[in-house]
C-alpha cells in the first residue's frame, strides 16, 4: 500500500469561484508592441455586466478556468494572462459591446495559425455567460508575423512569373462544377484560355470524384494549358485543386502538378484546415508553384453579424498561413460583400502597412513588414457590365473571375473569354486615359462592343441581370 500523501496548497491559495473581472479586466493596462490584440463583439447574457463578459473572454481564451486552482501559484499569471483592457458600446445596439483583449506573445506557438485560433476562437465561443461572441479583428505584431513564411510568392513574383503587368488578371471557374468527364473538362479549359483568359479554375468541390479522378483532370488540363500557350504566346494557368481527405494525398497531388510543369495549384483552406494549408504553402514556395486559395465554408463562420469571426480575421490568417490568391467577394456580384468593408480586408491582404480605420472595419493598425501580399479574387455572379466597377474598385492587383460570365456566352467559351478580355482592356485603357469608370463605365463598354461582336453579344445577353440584395456584412 502506498503511503498516504497530502499536497498542500501554497500560502494564500483560497479555493472557490471569483469574478473574472477581478483578475482579467485591467483598464489601466498599456498594450505592448509585442501583444496580439483582439477586438471581440460581445453580447452578454442578461444581468452579466460588460466588464465581466469581456474579462471572461480574456480569461477563457488564455489562462483562466471557471474556478480558482492552486496551480496558479506555480506560474506567473500576470505574465501569461489575457487582459481585457477596454470596452466600448456598439452604436445602435443596446446589448452589444466591443471588448479589446491583449494577449502576451508567449501564449502562442511560432508559425502556427492552428494554435493561434485554438486559443483565441476556441472554447470561449461556447461560453454560457455570453449570448453571442464575434471576433472582429486581430492585430498581429511583427514579432509574431515574422515567424510565418506567408504567401509562397506574392504579387510581384507572380506577375514576373506570368509576365503580365498593368491590369487585373482574368479567370474563369469551369461549369458545370460537377459532372464533366476529364477530357470534356480539359476542352472547356482550353477554349477559355485560348480566348484570352489568364487562368481557369477548378470549383471548390472538384476533388477526385467517380466521374472525374484527379489525375485524369490534371493531365487533360495540363494539355489544355500547353496548347493554349502555344497558340496565344501568353503564359496560362489552371487552378488544379489539390484539396484531399488527407495531407499526404494533398501533397501527392501537388507533387504531380509540379511534375506536369503547370504554374499553379489550389486549396480549400478552411475545409482543408490551416495545418494542411501551411504545409502546402511551404511546398509551393520550395517548388515554384503559385497557390490559389478558395474560402469555401467562410460564410458559416463570418456571415452572422453578432457571432463567429469576421472575414478580415480569416484573411489575415490566410496571409500568414500562405496563399497567393484568395476569394474576397465582389461588391457587385451575387455573393456577400459591402464596399468599404470589402476594401478594408482587401487592403489587409495586399498592402504592407494598413492604418486603423473604423469606417472600413479596421480596428487596429497592421504592419506586415516584408511579408508578401495576396491577390484578392473577385468572383461570383459577375459579367461584362460589371467590368468598369470591378476595375475601379479592385485596381490592377486583383483577379477578376467570370464563371457563368464566360461559359454562359451564347457563342461558347472562347467568345465568352474574348468578350471579357476586350471589356477589361477597354476599361484599363479608359482609366489610364483619365476617364471616370464610375460614371462612364457603361459608355466605355458600349464603345468597345462596336468593334467586338463577342462583347456585343455578351452585353445583350446580360443587360438585365442584377443581384440587388442588401449586404449583411455592414459596419
From Swiss-Prot:
Chief localisation class: plastid
Species whose genome carries this gene: Picea sitchensis
UniProt PTM comment: The disulfide bond which can form in the large chain dimeric partners within the hexadecamer appears to be associated with oxidative stress and protein turnover.
Function: RuBisCO catalyzes two reactions: the carboxylation of D-ribulose 1,5-bisphosphate, the primary event in carbon dioxide fixation, as well as the oxidative fragmentation of the pentose substrate in the photorespiration process. Both reactions occur simultaneously and in competition at the same active site.
GO terms classed as biological process: photorespiration; reductive pentose-phosphate cycle
UniProt-annotated binding residues for Mg(2+): 201, 203-204
Miscellaneous comment in the UniProt entry for this protein: The basic functional RuBisCO is composed of a large chain homodimer in a 'head-to-tail' conformation. In form I RuBisCO this homodimer is arranged in a barrel-like tetramer with the small subunits forming a tetrameric 'cap' on each end of the 'barrel'.
Name of this protein: Ribulose bisphosphate carboxylase large chain
Positions of the pro-segment in this chain: 1-2
Binding site for substrate: 123, 173, 177, 295, 327, 379
Catalytic activity: 2 (2R)-3-phosphoglycerate + 2 H(+) = D-ribulose 1,5-bisphosphate + CO2 + H2O; D-ribulose 1,5-bisphosphate + O2 = 2-phosphoglycolate + (2R)-3-phosphoglycerate + 2 H(+)
PANTHER family the record matches: RIBULOSE BISPHOSPHATE CARBOXYLASE (PTHR42704), RIBULOSE BISPHOSPHATE CARBOXYLASE LARGE CHAIN (PTHR42704:SF15)
Family named by the database record: Belongs to the RuBisCO large chain family. Type I subfamily.
Stored PROSITE patterns: RUBISCO_LARGE
Entry annotated with the keyword NAD: no
InterPro entries tied to this protein: RuBisCO, RuBisCo_large_chain_AS, RuBisCO_lsu_C, RuBisCO_lsu_C_sf, RuBisCO_lsu_fd_N, RuBisCO_lsu_N_sf, RuBisCO_lsuI
E.C. numbers: 4.1.1.39
Modified residues (N-acetylproline): 3
Active site residues according to the UniProt entry: 175 (proton acceptor), 294 (proton acceptor)
Localization, UniProt: Plastid, Chloroplast
A cellular component annotation (GO) from this entry: chloroplast
Residues carrying the site annotation Transition state stabilizer: 334
Cofactor remark from the record: Binds 1 Mg(2+) ion per subunit.
Amino acid at each position: 500500500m502506498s503511503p498516504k500523501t497530502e499536497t498542500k496548497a501554497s500560502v494564500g491559495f483560497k479555493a472557490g469561484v471569483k469574478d473574472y473581472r477581478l483578475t482579467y479586466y485591467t483598464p489601466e493596462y498599456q498594450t505592448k508592441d509585442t501583444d496580439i490584440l483582439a477586438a471581440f463583439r460581445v453580447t452578454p447574457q442578461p444581468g452579466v455586466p460588460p466588464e465581466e463578459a469581456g474579462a471572461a473572454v480574456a480569461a477563457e481564451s488564455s489562462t483562466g478556468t471557471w474556478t480558482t486552482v492552486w496551480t496558479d501559484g506555480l506560474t506567473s499569471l500576470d505574465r501569461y494572462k489575457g487582459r481585457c483592457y477596454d470596452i466600448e458600446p456598439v452604436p445602435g445596439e443596446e446589448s452589444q459591446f466591443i471588448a479589446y483583449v491583449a494577449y502576451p506573445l508567449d501564449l502562442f506557438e511560432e508559425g502556427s495559425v492552428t494554435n493561434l485560433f485554438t486559443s483565441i476562437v476556441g472554447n470561449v465561443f461556447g461560453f454560457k455567460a455570453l449570448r453571442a461572441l464575434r471576433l472582429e479583428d486581430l492585430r498581429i505584431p511583427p514579432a509574431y508575423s515574422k515567424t510565418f513564411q506567408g504567401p509562397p510568392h506574392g504579387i510581384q513574383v507572380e506577375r514576373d512569373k506570368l509576365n503580365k503587368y498593368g491590369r487585373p488578371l482574368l479567370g474563369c471557374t469551369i461549369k458545370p462544377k460537377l459532372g464533366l468527364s476529364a477530357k470534356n473538362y480539359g476542352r472547356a479549359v482550353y477554349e477559355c484560355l485560348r480566348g484570352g483568359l489568364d487562368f481557369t479554375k477548378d470549383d471548390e468541390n472538384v476533388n477526385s470524384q467517380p466521374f472525374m479522378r484527379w489525375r485524369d483532370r490534371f493531365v487533360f488540363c495540363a494539355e489544355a494549358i500547353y496548347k493554349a500557350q502555344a497558340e496565344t504566346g501568353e503564359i496560362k494557368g489552371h487552378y488544379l485543386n489539390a484539396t484531399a481527405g488527407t495531407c499526404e494525398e494533398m501533397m501527392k497531388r501537388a507533387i504531380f502538378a509540379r511534375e506536369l510543369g503547370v504554374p499553379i495549384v489550389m486549396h480549400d483552406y478552411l475545409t482543408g484546415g490551416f495545418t494542411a494549408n501551411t504545409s502546402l504553402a511551404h511546398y509551393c514556395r520550395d517548388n515554384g508553384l503559385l497557390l490559389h486559395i478558395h474560402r469555401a465554408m467562410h460564410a458559416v463562420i463570418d456571415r452572422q453579424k453578432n457571432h463567429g469571426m469576421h472575414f478580415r480575421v480569416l484573411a489575415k490568417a490566410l496571409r500568414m498561413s500562405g496563399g497567393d490568391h484568395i476569394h474576397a467577394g465582389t461588391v457587385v456580384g451575387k455573393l456577400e460583400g459591402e464596399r468599404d468593408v470589402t476594401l478594408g480586408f482587401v487592403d489587409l491582404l495586399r498592402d504592407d502597412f494598413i492604418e486603423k480605420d473604423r469606417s472600413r472595419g479596421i480596428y487596429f493598425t497592421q504592419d506586415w513588414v516584408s511579408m508578401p501580399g495576396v491577390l484578392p479574387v473577385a468572383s461570383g455572379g459577375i459579367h461584362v457590365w460589371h467590368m468598369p466597377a470591378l476595375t475601379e474598385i479592385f485596381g490592377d492587383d486583383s483577379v477578376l473571375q467570370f464563371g457563368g460570365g464566360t461559359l454562359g456566352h451564347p457563342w461558347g467559351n472562347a467568345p465568352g473569354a474574348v468578350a471579357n478580355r476586350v471589356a477589361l482592356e477597354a476599361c484599363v485603357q479608359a482609366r489610364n486615359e483619365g476617364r471616370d469608370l464610375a460614371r462612364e463605365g457603361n459608355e466605355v463598354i458600349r464603345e468597345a462592343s462596336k468593334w467586338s461582336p463577342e462583347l456585343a453579344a455578351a452585353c445583350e445577353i446580360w443587360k438585365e441581370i442584377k443581384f440587388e440584395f442588401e449586404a449583411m456584412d455592414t459596419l
